[in-house]
Regions:
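Short acidic-hydrophobic catalytic motif
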Residues: 1-199
């Protein structure tokens, strides 16, 4: 996710924005001195904790709302992702993911109340497939990524020299891998990747 104004762009804002929304913050100023938000632990939890540590101040200005009055569907250019927004009297979010992967296939997550966000969603980490890492690094992305701040999914067999090369791109030491799965499990929830997409 990228925010832009004129020539200025900042990316990977979604963890912070989710935390702000969950905490009820709709007006704040955040200074960033890089083109990418810090990944921290790969979740929204550090942002929630920071907001909780200072609290939220109610302002006298009236809050502006966007009211959903009809179904809206947004689809990515490649057609692989979509978001459907439906009018309702209560807030809820459902996320469904479907990857062509023997490790991460179909998953589903639901959030019926923002009161559940901190305990059920905020700590769910971002994830990446080993087979995509080299391409992401070459594109100048995942600059702060490592085994401590993302679930790393190993779903396509590779020999150790290939894994060593990928790790070198990240400035990391490659783990010794003997089977397909999550390189840095265990998962916090069986559907942690879907919960992260919900975030």
């Amino acid at each position: 996710t990228v925010l832009a104004k004129g020539e200025v762009k900042v990316s990977t804002i979604e963890h912070c924005m989710a935390a702000l929304y969950a905490a009820g913050v709709d007006n704040c100023e955040i200074e960033v001195n890089a083109p990418e938000f810090p990944i921290l632990d790969g979740s929204a939890k550090p942002f929630i904790e920071a907001i909780n540590s200072v609290g939220v101040e109610e302002q006298s200005a009236e809050r502006e709302y966007y009211e959903v009055t009809s179904k809206k569907v947004f689809t990515s250019e490649d057609g692989k992702s979509s978001i459907t927004i439906l009018p309702d009297t209560e807030f809820s979010v459902q996320a469904m993911v479907n990857y062509d992967s023997c490790v991460l296939g179909n998953q589903y997550a639901i959030l019926d109340s923002m009161n559940e966000f901190e305990a059920e969603v905020a700590g769910c980490r971002t994830f990446v497939f080993v087979r995509e890492i080299a391409q992401l690094v070459e594109a100048g992305l995942i600059k702060g990524g490592d085994l401590t701040n993302a679930l790393v999914i190993y779903d396509t067999p590779a020999d150790q020299s290939q894994l060593d090369k990928i790790a070198e791109l990240l400035g990391q030491t490659a783990p010794q891998v003997s089977e397909l799965g999550y390189l840095n499990g265990p998962l916090q929830f069986d559907n942690e990747p879907a919960r992260h997409k919900l975030l």
